């Protein structure tokens, strides 16, 4: 059995060598483990030679740095004194997906310079939900309201003589514009009727900005078709309509498929959407026939060959379990 003195001697001999080997091992691996970062260099690593920088995967260190970046809410572009103002008229009404629809639309409009959002609620008063949402966006907006009388509202029957949803709200916006701007106003502007459930390309707003009288373009997912569009001849003039539903309408076009010069709206003070005696699909014609003829229309979107707006609709949420056993708090705004 080894003596205690012998064990101590072995420990004193082995311990220094163990420490030396450990230090040497760490110093030899350090260059391989270290992340080099030169002063003044971009914290993101450059892609290897020949690699597509858009497909190059950054290191874990870079990903962590991106996650730590604080979110900054985007505000609209600076106002320009040279660009015409686009007045976007949006009727809206209370429903479970209203805030989601308006939020999505606001996120699009935030990228459009010189834009004024005219939001008109179908309600007896302006609702706090819509008021807060508009205020928080930072957009240039006007918040109006007018309630459609119950006996005017559609009941889902195409033969029902009641007016289509949004008619009174769009008319209130037209009245507001005429009361705000004098009839002989020289301020350049364009009026566009944009529902809150559609999807809009940013290119669409730049296309309509140069509207002299009334500009037109295709709209996707309407009339039971992939898209409806004005029919344009070789001379760049609108001569008809590519649609199945009643193609002989004066203006067989969807509400999202045209924009009107502000001066024309101000000068033709009698032009409104008709409340009575208008068949389904004729609301657009009831306004446009008071403003222009077919020959006056200006085809946009590459002579009406590009799709820049989609008549999308959010699926109605199934809330069959709502209110059972107090599972959710009804005071939480959605």
Swiss-Prot record:
Feature type site, description Interaction with galactose moiety of substrate glycoprotein: 228, 321
Tissue specificity annotation: Brain. Greater expression found in the cerebral cortex than the cerebellum.
Q: Return the CDD domains for the record.
A: GlcAT-I (cd00218)
Q: Which parts of the sequence are annotated with region: Interaction with galactose moiety of substrate glycoprotein?
A: 245-254
Any stretches that span the bilayer, and where are they?
7-27
Query: Which cellular components does GO assign to this protein?
Result: endoplasmic reticulum membrane; extracellular region; Golgi lumen; Golgi membrane
After translation, the protein is modified as follows: The soluble form derives from the membrane form by proteolytic processing.
Provide a GO biological process annotation.
cellular response to hypoxia
Point out residues bearing the modification Phosphothreonine. 103, 108
Cofactors required? Mn(2+)
Q: Which family does it belong to?
A: Belongs to the glycosyltransferase 43 family.
The name of this protein is: Galactosylgalactosylxylosylprotein 3-beta-glucuronosyltransferase 1
The taxonomic lineage of its organism, from the top, reads: Eukaryota, Metazoa, Chordata, Craniata, Vertebrata
Tell me the gene name: B3gat1
